Amino acid sequence: MLGDHPVFPILLSIDLDASRSFYRDTLGLRLVREDPGRLVFACGGGTQLVISGSTTGTRDTQTQMAWRVPDIHAALADLRARGVRIEEYTAPDPVTTDGIADMGYAWAAWFIDPSRNCVAVVEPK
């Protein structure tokens, strides 16, 4: 049953004002709802990204969510033009070149949001 329904990520934020500014103003997402302790942004295909206020944030340094994009080079050019710093990794895995890693099944790149969530863009192969 659940396989027939969309999912939406929920990221934790220790500073909702900074998250609002980053996702709305820097990334250009449309803020569709704001409640005490929660922001909801519209994304492609009718999906949504929820940012939930947290006193602790995330302690995980792994990827929390990813956008599937048709052209990772164009996505990175847009992100960089918006002032987003793309992460570079040298070892052990993944290794990036100009911010992009070959994951075998896809090309991927990562950036960090104001609450230290690791977010990716992924171009399937």
Q: Where in the sequence are the language-model features?
A:
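N-terminal beta-strand motif that seeds the catalytic metal site of vicinal oxygen chelate
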Residues: 1-17, 62-65, 122-125
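Structural preference for long, well-ordered alpha-helical segments within the folded cores
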Residues: 21-22, 78, 115
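Core segments of cupin and vicinal oxygen chelate
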Residues: 4, 10-48, 74
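Vicinal oxygen chelate
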Residues: 1-2, 67, 82-125
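Conserved short beta-strand elements that form part of the metal-binding/catalytic scaffold
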Residues: 30-70, 87-88, 114, 118-123
